[in-house]
């Protein structure tokens, strides 16, 4: 009976919570949740277990993939690196998301770059996210080198040079992109 209840609970977990649980699996640092609205930009900081209790089905909700020592989203307070990521602004290319994904699957993933753990449709583009074994901020120079390699490799697909920082916030699956009025989804 307990197993059946646990399985039912798993089914009811939102896409957002499942994503957070995977990305921040054993995170000990602070995670930033941000909301961008007509009133401006607001951010809050939570530990992993606090964050999963929140709602994410609203417009323009983002989180950090890496964590911080303090409740400040600044590079000097970076605690753990959990993931590498590339933000593909596909709307700035001559290709559809589907064409880009087909090209990446056929010619890049598993060849020039590893296959990402997550591909997320952010509304106007795609996020490619690679989970890494949690490492301290001392690994930042290596992390940056890999990010820059991914950027150079994926530049023709709309890779955003402005989105290569370890403190970056990305839209969370289950939230709504207000520019396109579409749900951010894991593909």
Each PLM stretch: what is its role?
Residues 1-83, 90-101, 168, 176-179:
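DNA replication initiation on ssDNA origins
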Residues 2, 31-33, 112-113, 142-145:
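Long, low-complexity interaction regions most often at the N-terminus
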Residues 16, 51-59, 105-115, 151-158:
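Structural alpha-beta junctions
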Residues 57-58, 79-81, 112-115, 122-124, ...:
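Short, well-ordered loop/turn elements at secondary-structure boundaries
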Residues 70-76, 105-123, 157-161:
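Catalytic micro-motifs at enzyme active sites that drive phosphoryl/nucleotidyl and oxygen chemistry
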Residues 86, 114-139, 169-173, 177:
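Histidine-centered divalent-metal-coordination microenvironment in nucleic-acid enzymes
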Residues 94-110, 132-158, 180-187:
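Helical (often loop-to-helix) elements that flank the catalytic cores of nucleotide-handling enzymes
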Residues 160-187:
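Basic/polar, cationic surfaces and motifs that engage anionic cell-wall
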